[in-house]
């Protein structure tokens, strides 16, 4: 079930504050976050986020096509190891 339209998109307040401050300062260093559930807003475009995948931080550069998606979609949490050929 998707989120109700009247509630609007979710973003952590501390993350939005960091992005706004970063845009004012014109600095482009990665913003470290554990908030995989936050929706990408248009203000995020052009910034780099270090998104936690449970073990390490994955750098995600936000483009226009990513607006409306979640940060966690671009930081995979599982690594597939190929099945062995000889059995």
UniProtKB/Swiss-Prot annotation:
Q: Which UniProt keywords apply?
A: Ribonucleoprotein, Ribosomal protein, RNA-binding, rRNA-binding
Gene3D superfamilies on file: 30s Ribosomal Protein S19, Chain A (3.30.860.10)
Single GO cellular component annotation? small ribosomal subunit
**Gene Ontology molecular functions:** rRNA binding; structural constituent of ribosome
One GO biological process this protein is involved in is:
translation
For this protein, the record's InterPro entries field holds: Ribosomal_uS19 (IPR002222), Ribosomal_uS19_bac-type (IPR005732), Ribosomal_uS19_CS (IPR020934), Ribosomal_uS19_SF (IPR023575)
The entry sums up its family as follows:
Belongs to the universal ribosomal protein uS19 family.
The record's function comment reads: Protein S19 forms a complex with S13 that binds strongly to the 16S ribosomal RNA.
Which named protein is this? Small ribosomal subunit protein uS19
**What is the organism of origin for this protein?**
Mycoplasma pneumoniae (strain ATCC 29342 / M129 / Subtype 1)
